[in-house]
Amino acid sequence: MSRLYGPVERKPRNEYGTLHLVRFLGTDYGRRRIGLALSDPSGLLSRPWKTLASHGNRHAVAKMIGAEIAQLLAEDDGLAGIVLGYPRKLGGEPTDQTAAVTALADTLRLSVSVPIVLQDERLSSREAESLLARRIKNWRDRKPLLDAASAAVILQDYLDGRAPMSDRIAGPEDLES
């Protein structure tokens, strides 16, 4: 379940009549580290991108994430939206981190021009750990990758739930001029 901060506009075609590709940034915000993930330009798949050190208050963190967003907006693929992991307990109650994420979303919303979505992140770290453990046996080698992998899980959950597959995949009629 996601909570939307502003509309996510999706333009199916650009001015040349070809499919308009969209990219999203996924974020797993923690007290020590911030995991970042990116979707592919088609908006179908996520991948871990990088991990940032989280130090300072939410304004400092928002500034740091804002710099990453500015860099992504300047690239050819652009950025259609930001997906922030929204922490909840298994029963749905807020955690001690929920208010911090909501405050970060509010701060980011004031400083960036792209929509922000809060996406349920329950069990995302466990799923990311499980996925990494299949490829990397040593915990010390997995640990630095965990936050970005968790962000990729959160982002993939959002991408999977945002539109039916038929709305996201080009058919033969989309390939004709």
Locate the predicted segments by residue.
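Phosphate- and other anionic-substrate recognition elements at nucleic-acid/protein interfaces
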Residues: 2-27, 31-177
